[in-house]
């Protein structure tokens, strides 16, 4: 249960598995907030304090589900009109959410779980591929949408690109 935009300040069930794409409560901020995965940090901190494996199990299950069910828009031409249509709308892949995911939630997954059984093997490979995909989207499409580099969204998107580079310096 999370309190998110559109829920009237009341905790709402986001699904098990999480429904990442359905716009609920007639508020686009709800979908965007769910896809920022801000609740992961609290679970990772709880794991660090308690050692209770239910927390990283839930975070990695949600991450695996998101990667499997929310593919990046494919074959988007590198022009401003197509970039806006693909990455500046109510979807899990709106550029602002792509950036925020990298520095606010996926960075925390990397920070807390790297070197553990929770982020190893094939799961780490899927995670690294998804981070690289996020970095590609941010590096190609954010400058197309904000060509004058004059928008606060671009700052958060570029911060996401920085954190993606910090997570995968050899990619």
Residue ranges, per PLM feature:
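Aromatic-lined, polymer-binding surfaces characteristic
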Residues: 10-11, 17, 27-171
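Low-complexity, Ser/Thr/Pro/Gly-enriched N-terminal "stalk/linker" regions
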Residues: 1-20
């Amino acid at each position: 249960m999370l309190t998110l935009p559109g829920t009237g300040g009341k905790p709402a069930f986001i699904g098990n598995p999480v429904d990442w794409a359905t716009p609920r409560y007639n508020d686009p901020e709800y979908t965007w907030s769910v896809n920022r995965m801000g609740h992961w940090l609290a679970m990772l901190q709880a794991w660090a304090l308690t050692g209770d494996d239910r927390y990283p199990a839930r975070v990695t299950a949600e991450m695996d589900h998101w990667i499997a069910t929310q593919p990046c828009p494919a074959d988007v031409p590198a022009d401003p009109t197509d970039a806006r249509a693909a990455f500046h709308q109510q979807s899990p892949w709106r550029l602002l959410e792509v950036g925020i995911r990298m520095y606010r939630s996926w960075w925390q997954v990397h920070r807390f779980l790297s070197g553990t059984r929770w982020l190893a093997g094939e799961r780490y490979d899927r995670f690294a591929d998804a981070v690289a995909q996020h970095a590609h989207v941010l590096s190609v499409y954010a400058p197309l949408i904000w060509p004058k580099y004059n928008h606060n969204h671009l700052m958060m998107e570029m911060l996401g690109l920085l954190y993606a580079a910090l997570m995968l310096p050899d990619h």
